[in-house]
Regions:
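Collagenous Gly-X-Y triple-helix signature in extracellular proteins
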Residues: 2-6, 13-146
Length: 146
């Protein structure tokens, strides 16, 4: 579905039996969180700011989680517009979907500045670092997929 970046452990967060804070878990470690009352599997895909990348600013310094399975299929945009910043999916992820997490988890998810193409398509301009798009949950881009 997308990524969330958590800032350390939060009271009530699901922890492994050893009780390590999420910030100390290795990349590839599984994490289980409740989404809309259902235990859902995530994987830790990064710790800190992605290495060797100037695309991300300090807001992205945290534990990056990827939902292991597709939660649901949603439309990108109901109109014929290719702008992620005003897309239906961006709005859904950072409002409706975000609110499916318990409040303590929602509070632990960091707001980050995500690299994106402002105004989309060939007429847009790449934005990154401090000029990134503010969000808490986002779809993977081609860059993040690798």
């Amino acid at each position: 579905m997308g990524r969330v970046i958590l800032s350390g452990a939060s009271k009530g967060m699901t922890k492994p039996t050893v009780g390590a804070p999420i910030s100390e878990l290795a990349v590839g470690s599984p994490v289980r969180l409740s989404v809309n009352g259902t235990v859902t599997d995530f994987l830790i895909v990064n710790q800190g700011i992605p290495s060797n990348s100037i695309l991300y600013d300090s807001s992205c310094n945290g534990t990056w989680l990827l939902m292991k399975n597709i939660y649901e299929n949603r439309v990108w945009q109901s109109g014929n517009i290719n702008k992620y910043e005003s897309s239906d999916i961006h709005t859904y992820l950072n409002n409706t979907f975000l609110n499916l997490f318990e409040s303590n988890i929602r509070d632990a998810i960091k707001q980050v500045k995500l690299p994106y193409r402002k105004n989309g398509g060939s007429g847009g301009s790449d934005q990154s670092g401090a000029n990134g798009l503010l969000c808490k949950i986002f779809l993977l881009s081609g860059y993040e997929i690798g």
